[in-house]
């Protein structure tokens, strides 16, 4: 049996079912191209019979994709299979995927049929699909809850009818690894013609075991895993593509399997899917979460600096992330601060490590995470200030509404004795406030990230706005709190401006330090 595991991506079919709004054809094509670069063997890109829009998107993707096999889903009905063929026939390589429910609860309560009738429908569907292609996948929906005798029977008959891939879905995420692995093992032991088809699995994550079930299935003979980028999917989602791909790569020593996935494309593909689908990735998500390669514990940070493999079983670079991240918090040790200062270009003789570290811990206790510009300011000014106040927002007034151009008027104090009143228009009230602040400061700031969260509950809840912005190639962070979201957004932008002002002061001191060294 081959050690190659086929990666069947269904982000654009099963994954899209989790979205509140459908993707456009252009967006689907962007994701399809990304999946092709990633190296997926098969991509299921839609359910052609379900809507004219889905039909057209499948047809468009089928014409454009050259290096992955394009698949369309169909029920075990001739009209569905015909629609799939018509959408897919322009592809260089395609697969028709047809399915029918096989569990007793589905057969009796959903289909209102007997199992024998379902068996006949499945056989006829496979035969009909074989009129169009020799690559036919047959799925036994809710296989995880299907009586094993019935499952063995329908798998054998589907292979006889011409199915080249048999998919065993845990449709409701009900099974656990040893149980699901046992189902796959039983099929290999009891289905006489099973060597004539590839056994696939499609596991949902309702109990958080989709990835574990998929890996166990492969250990028991399955050679295709159906999965989605970021684990997107109905309810709790699907088996995560990036997780199974990196498990198979990282633990090849134990498992012995390979895939065609290019791991260097994982991070980029994950971010694209997240952005286009408007589905944020949780920070602690394995492989692709913001914290996946971040270290905050001082002990862990010290270990990683000494040898990366002390706390990292794979490198961030291996999945397309430029580097790991050592978050500077009150738990960070002296070694980490010294290392970061070296990365920023300072020699050990440029500062007193004990004094800097004491100031750092004091600031970190107040602020939480400390950034590079904070650390440099501590070095030069030895002033622990979690909220620099060069720019101080006195008031903001915004006028906006249907048919009106949003206008913001801001009163701001600058330095010790300057007060400025400025007004600006924008594309909405927050943009108007942003334009006004840019006029006041004369800065050219690009907003990279903008997040709104509620602090508290009810009508008195505070809106917390977190901003990441770029100025002169450097990242700056800002935070604002208010019961008014426009005010909290403005405060966050002012916070960024103050950090930039501090960084400018640091740059002057740094230049003088370099000049002294040269003299």
Curated annotation (Swiss-Prot):
This is 2-isopropylmalate synthase. GO terms for molecular function: 2-isopropylmalate synthase activity; acetyl-CoA C-acetyltransferase activity; manganese ion binding. It comes from Psychromonas ingrahamii (strain DSM 17664 / CCUG 51855 / 37). The gene is leuA. It is an enzyme of class 2 (transferase). Its main location: cytoplasm. Pathway: Amino-acid biosynthesis; L-leucine biosynthesis; L-leucine from 3-methyl-2-oxobutanoate: step 1/4. Belongs to the alpha-IPM synthase/homocitrate synthase family. LeuA type 1 subfamily. Residues 5-267 form the Pyruvate carboxyltransferase domain. One of its GO terms (cellular component) is cytosol. Residues 392-519 are annotated as: Regulatory domain. Mn(2+) binds at residues 14, 202, 204, 238. Catalyzes the condensation of the acetyl group of acetyl-CoA with 3-methyl-2-oxobutanoate (2-ketoisovalerate) to form 3-carboxy-3-hydroxy-4-methylpentanoate (2-isopropylmalate). It is found in: Cytoplasm. Keywords: Amino-acid biosynthesis, Branched-chain amino acid biosynthesis, Cytoplasm, Leucine biosynthesis, Manganese, Metal-binding, Transferase. Its EC number is 2.3.3.13.
């Amino acid at each position: 049996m081959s050690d190659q595991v086929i990666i069947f991506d269904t982000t654009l079919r099963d994954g899209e079912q989790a979205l509140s709004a459908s993707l456009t054809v252009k967006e689907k094509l962007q994701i399809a191209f990304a999946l092709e670069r990633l190296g997926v063997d098969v991509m299921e890109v839609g359910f052609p019979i379900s809507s004219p829009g889905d039909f057209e998107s499948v047809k468009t993707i089928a014409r454009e994709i050259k290096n992955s096999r394009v698949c369309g889903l169909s029920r075990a009905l001739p009209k569905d299979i015909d629609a799939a063929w018509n959408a897919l026939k322009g592809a260089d390589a395609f697969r028709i995927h047809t399915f029918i429910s096989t569990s007793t609860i589905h057969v009796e309560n959903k289909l209102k049929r007997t199992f024998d009738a379902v068996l006949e429908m499945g056989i006829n569907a496979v035969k009909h699909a074989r009129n169009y292609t020799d690559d036919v996948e047959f799925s036994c929906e809710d296989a995880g809850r299907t009586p094993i005798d019935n499952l063995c029977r329908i798998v054998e008959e589907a292979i006889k009818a011409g199915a080249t891939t048999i998919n065993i879905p845990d449709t409701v995420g009900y099974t656990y690894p040893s149980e699901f692995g046992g189902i796959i093992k039983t099929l290999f032991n009891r289905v006489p013609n099973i060597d004539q088809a590839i056994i696939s699995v499609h596991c949902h994550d309702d109990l958080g075991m989709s990835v574990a079930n998929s890996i166990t299935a492969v250990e028991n003979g399955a050679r295709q895993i159906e999965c989605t980028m970021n684990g997107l999917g109905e309810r709790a989602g699907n088996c995560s593509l990036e997780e199974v791909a990196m498990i198979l790569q990282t633990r090849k020593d134990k498992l012995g399997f390979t895939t065609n996935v290019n791991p260097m494309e994982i991070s980029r593909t994950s971010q694209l899917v997240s952005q286009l689908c408007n589905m944020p990735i949780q920070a602690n998500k394995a492989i692709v979460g913001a914290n996946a390669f971040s270290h905050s514990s001082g002990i862990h940070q010290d270990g990683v600096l000494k040898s990366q493999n002390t706390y990292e079983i794979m490198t961030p670079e291996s999945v397309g992330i430029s580097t790991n991240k050592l978050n500077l918090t009150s738990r960070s040790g002296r070694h980490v601060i010294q290392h970061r200062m070296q990365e920023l270009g300072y020699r050990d003789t440029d500062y007193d490590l004990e004094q800097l570290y004491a100031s750092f811990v004091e600031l970190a206790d107040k602020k939480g995470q400390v950034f590079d510009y904070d650390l440099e300011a501590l070095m030069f000014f030895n002033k622990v200030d979690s909220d620099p106040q060069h720019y101080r927002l006195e008031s903001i007034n915004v006028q906006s509404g249907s048919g009106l151009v949003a206008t913001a008027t801001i009163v701001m104090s600058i330095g010790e004795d300057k007060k400025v009143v400025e007004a600006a228009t924008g594309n909405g009230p927050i943009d108007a406030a942003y334009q006004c602040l840019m006029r006041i400061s004369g800065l050219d700031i690009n907003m990279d990230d903008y997040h709104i969260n509620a602090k508290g509950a009810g009508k008195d809840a505070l809106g917390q706005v977190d901003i990441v912005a770029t100025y002169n190639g450097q990242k700056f962070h800002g935070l604002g709190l208010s019961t008014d979201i426009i005010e909290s957004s403005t405060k966050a932008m002012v916070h960024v401006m103050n950090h930039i002002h501090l960084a400018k002061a640091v740059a002057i001191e740094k230049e003088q330090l370099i000049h002294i060294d040269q003299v």
